[in-house]
Amino acid sequence: MSMAEYKGKVKNIQDTPFGYTLSLIGGKWKMVIIYLLAEDQPIRFKELKRQIGTITYKTLSSQLKELEADGLVKRKEYPQVPPKVEYSLTDKAGTLLPILEELCEWGVKNQNN
């Protein structure tokens, strides 16, 4: 259903596909993480933290766990010392990439307005 088809019928935004999508990618960091993983994957935790910069280790860990639980991020552990863990996008997350491209295009058009 399109947005117009829900007009006047929705009592709770969480009951819509839009609400479901926001529950997966909403928040301050999830889209940033998905964007960075789309640019450079697989990527290790510390490299992801370095690229984001202002996120805390605890928050990054929490956001990655949520994205993994929602099926958007894969976590691969390597049995070695020191431990090595890499993160990458799932196929499900890959279907979000055209939306990210559209957001980037919107930003290009509107950034300086």
UniProtKB/Swiss-Prot annotation:
Every HTH hxlR-type domain range: 16-113
Keywords, comma-separated and alphabetical: DNA-binding, Transcription, Transcription regulation
Entry GO MF terms: DNA binding
Any Pfam family: HxlR
Cleaved signal peptide residues: none
Domain of life: Bacteria
Presence of keyword Transcription regulation: yes
Cysteines paired by S-S bonds: none
Keyword Transcription regulation: yes
PROSITE patterns: HTH_HXLR
PANTHER family, per database record: TRANSCRIPTIONAL REGULATOR, TRANSCRIPTIONAL REGULATOR, MARR FAMILY
Name of this chain's protein: Uncharacterized HTH-type transcriptional regulator BH0655
Classification of source organism: Bacteria, Bacillati, Bacillota, Bacilli, Bacillales
